[in-house]
Amino acid sequence: MASQKNVFILLGNGFSIDMMKTIGKSDEINLNNLFACGADVPWPETETPGFLSFQNCPNLWTLGARPYLDKELALEIIEEVITCANILPQRTEIKDKIYIRAYNELEQYLMSLFVYYTRKVDITKAKGKLKSWGWTKYLRQLNADSNIKTVSIVSLNYDVWLENLLDMFSIPYSIDGFSSTKEKIHIYKPQGSIAFHSTKRDRAAYSIPDRNSFDNHKLDEFRYDNKNLDCLNIINALIPPAGDSSRLKQSWSADIRNHIKVLAKTLKKDDSVVICGVSYWHVDRKEIDTYLSEMPSDIKHLVMVNPNPPEVLNAVLMTLFDQYVVIPNSTNLMKL
């Protein structure tokens, strides 16, 4: 019997984009421009559309956030807000600034956006299409292969489509920080998730808080549930896109990141690493670098799945590793 090996998978937004493309929902679920559906996202108190509006997000709106912006302008505004939030923990006092208020609005908006997206698309109705998707085949193969000891998936996505996919095909998994037992497939979510629930507030009392986004919280303040989603958490466990989770100093995220670092350091040259759909923006690459730099440089099986991989990430991989392969989609994953 061949010696068992481990598989480390790092998933970015491209994984979810590919899934929506596979089931024909890319037009309804816009993951490239997070403001595009803002006028349709319901305000939790009233459940009426218009979360992204001057009425509900006056600070984001004042900074230029609009549902009709193109994705480049939308990303520019998000990066401005997050860059200010990243620097904030270095100050002893939080001042009442528009970018800080906008950050709170952005975090609450993203929670509502991804809950809205999840309710809008029932992936179980696309089981036939997903059965033939490269990622589904690959994950099923890994789970069934006795030569694979562990499959560690680091997901930088808030959504629960990965978990719902595994549930749909009866593939066991566990969630780091929440599961009492560790399955062969173990998922780490250092950027948080809409499935991380805290104490709930009454719907009629819903509002955007002034400070909760920056207060420190621990993993044991949350529970995991990917089926019963809502937007009524008193505390949201989300690090907005382009946010540096290490600088925002959230204990729940730090615990998960530390587990990933230890995991990356234990990889051997005969193990496999798969990187999919990672943007590698300048404000979030520090976290990714932390994981990559812990891996052995002589690892034999390193694959990046991305139709348009960032050149700067290519440069980093060439610097850190002796070899790697780039493939445009998941079709050939099982052959590598």
Outline where the language-model segments fall.
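Gly/serine-rich nucleotide phosphate-binding loop at the start of the catalytic core
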Residues: 1-149
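SIR2/sirtuin-family catalytic core signature
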Residues: 1-19, 33, 43, 254-336
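Metabolite-binding pocket within alpha/beta catalytic cores that recognizes anionic/polar moieties
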Residues: 19, 127-187
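Short secondary-structure boundary/capping segments
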Residues: 22-35, 167-172, 205, 290-291
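Acidic, metal/cofactor-coordinating or nucleic-acid-engaging core segments within structured domains
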Residues: 56, 208, 214-268
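Short, flexible loop segments at the rims of nucleotide/cofactor-binding pockets, characterized by
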Residues: 123-132, 248-255, 280
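Covalent nucleotidyltransferase
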Residues: 139, 187-191, 208-218
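Extended hydrophobic/aromatic segments used for targeting, binding, or gating
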Residues: 160, 164, 168-201, 285-322
